[in-house]
Amino acid sequence: VNRRRGYALALAASVLIAGMGAARPTPAPTRTPSPSPTPTPSATQSDGTLQILTYRGYAEYGGTSPKVNWVGNFEKETGCRIAKLDTVQSAKEMEDLSAQRPYDVISAGPALAAKLIEDKQAQPIDPAKVSGYDDIDKRFRDMSTVSGKVYGVPYLWGYHEFIYDSTKVKGDLKQAFASDRVALRDSPLTIADAALADGSAKDPYELSQDELDRAVALLEQSKGRTYWRSPIDLVQGFATGSLDYAQATPYYRLLLQKAGKPVKALQTPETTGWVDSWMLGVNVPDTTCAYRWLNWVTAANAQRDAAAWVGLAPANAKACKGRAKAMCDLYGRGKKLDRVAFAVRPPGDCRADSGECTDYATWGKRWTALLAK
């Protein structure tokens, strides 16, 4: 048995790393392409260089595979030099780094994007300067538009599902939350998934105090569960037999199935998802290279490569060919996305100051308290 489990783990890990990369793939050192001067707190450099903050796998420079070097190609074709490329594994790491120093461009998720806009740390983008912007799905474009101003260029997106070992348990969503053998994403936004499972909330990101309490109560049922930050933990959990359920993406279900694990997805009427978008820093004195980067990452070819590499879907519909077709088919398109509640930073459009809804700070406190139990 141990030998079979070891083989399954090795196979899953090899597929994970070598097959298609990985969404927020295996940890790799932060890359500084060339020595960069110490940044000033007021502005980034304006000498034809770029300073980028993104997730691992979103802007490859050949460190994982010499055949995957988008940064090098960008530099050759545009004449702009990437002076600093900081990569992170989690949204929390990205928020922490973005608060420490300025960047020209950041690939932010919905919670951080809203914070950057609210704190005036991101500047509006002129979509007329971004070739291919209109090729991006309108629903994604609308998510990055605030008061008529565009603040982000949608890049990659995905959604969550609950997967389970079909030889051990049945597909029951509330049982998944109650189980000690379940792995949930380590994020306050997981409260939205609990709200969907509870079924009392109309919008999982606009929760009243009572709805928040009900969602957290559902999460508190199990004190022995795992909270993951790296998706590789999911692969290890199912490969070694220590997990019965997990919150994952369709991509990781596919990886486990290819590794011979009998995992299936729970069928739910609604689920949560997210869109990562490229944003422009507020203190960029010369945006020439920043806009060249935005044009580069909006193009179908760039999004096609990234989607196939990290196991997510491209925001540009024209990228759904060739290498990325499998990801587009896996996540779905068109009306299939109507069941996805795409994340916003709570309370979304609801007014927290009136007491109608709970804000993200409250979610964060409840999440921290949950992990401490």
Task: Kindly give the residue locations of the regions a language model identified.
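A ligand-binding cleft/hinge motif common to bilobed small-molecule-binding domains
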Residues: 112-115, 239, 245-262
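Conserved C-terminal helix/tail region of periplasmic/extracytoplasmic solute-binding proteins
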Residues: 342-373
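Periplasmic-binding protein-like
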Residues: 135, 158, 212-221, 257-282, ...
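Mature extracytoplasmic/periplasmic domains
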Residues: 281-346
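C-terminal region of N-terminal signal peptides and the immediate post-cleavage residues
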Residues: 18-46
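Extracytoplasmic ligand-binding site segments that recognize negatively charged/polar headgroups
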Residues: 55-67, 102-103, 107-242
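Early extracytoplasmic/lumenal segment of secretory-pathway proteins
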Residues: 39-115
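A bilobed periplasmic-binding-protein/Venus flytrap-type ligand-binding module shared by bacterial periplasmic
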Residues: 161-168, 196-200, 274-287, 297, ...
